[in-house]
Amino acid sequence: MENGFNEEAVDAAVAEAQTLGEEERWDEAHSLLLEALEEQGDTPLLLCWAGIAAQRLGSDSEAYDFFRRTLALGPEDPFVLATAGSGVALFDDPGAEGALRTAALVAPDFPFARAAYGAYLAREGLFAEAIGELEAARALAPGDAEVHADLAIAYLLAARQDDGVAALEEALSLRADDAWMRALYGLALLEARRGEEAAEQLHRAAAERVEDVELQLLSALASADQGWDDEAWNALARAEAAASAPDHELIEEVEDALQEGGDAPGALLRDDLAPSLLRERLLQKA
């Protein structure tokens, strides 16, 4: 027993939670970690992993509270600093920058720490510094799809279009089943005026993310712009099936463009919908 908690018990609880998480059993991991916190009290490692579990379950406010409490204990472990720092950064917490910078400084050979700090810097608009951190992370972990994706996002936010597209291609070569990343790739291809390739990628991503209304509408317009009428109307139908009330106005606008035909779908796609959604999703991921 040290510092009021049993270190072996904490490590065992975290190891079990990690195993459950790898099996996508995050609800069980969450319950296990709450029990461990009740038994052992607040420790940075337990709080951090409780934050991870809450985040995976979509409980963002609960995750933020766990990550905030983690940092309040002054952790030194770079994984804990980088994870909790990234977690509170999503809520613009002023403690994020210090935690992420410290993690990258104390563990310069730890790719997750470098990538987490780089992603934060990209979101803050410090693109040169962000790219430096993320390129360092890529050199340390060339087989990590997430690092390539984060670097791609920094490149695209910095208007380095070709580099961003290439980094997304590399990320997808490592994790081909990531439909969210594929949708981002399709948007980047649209920005690069590679319309047919973009339509193919958006169509493929939309077939997997059927509840993503915006993606269905992007796919509908991109398909129509290529003359793929059946694919366009099928994507619109999926959007209508998944839509909630705020989506209806945009759906009607896309439907009008499909009915008008000609240049209308491509114009709505390239001049309006795609640029705004690209930036929104880049910042969402960063």
Can you say where each PLM-predicted feature lies in the sequence?
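TPR-adjacent "capping" and linker segments in tetratricopeptide-repeat scaffold/adaptor proteins
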Residues: 1-12, 38
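Conserved structural position within tetratricopeptide repeats
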Residues: 4, 34-38, 68-72, 101-106, ...
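Position-specific recognition of the canonical hydrophobic site in helix A of tetratricopeptide repeat
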Residues: 21, 48, 55, 88-89, ...
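Structural signature of tandem alpha-helical TPR/SEL1-like repeats
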Residues: 23-31, 57-69, 88-102, 124-136, ...
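Eukaryotic alpha-helical solenoid repeat scaffolds
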Residues: 179, 183-187, 191-286
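Short coil turns that delineate tetratricopeptide repeat
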Residues: 41, 75, 108, 142, ...
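Canonical tetratricopeptide repeat
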Residues: 49, 83-84, 116, 150, ...
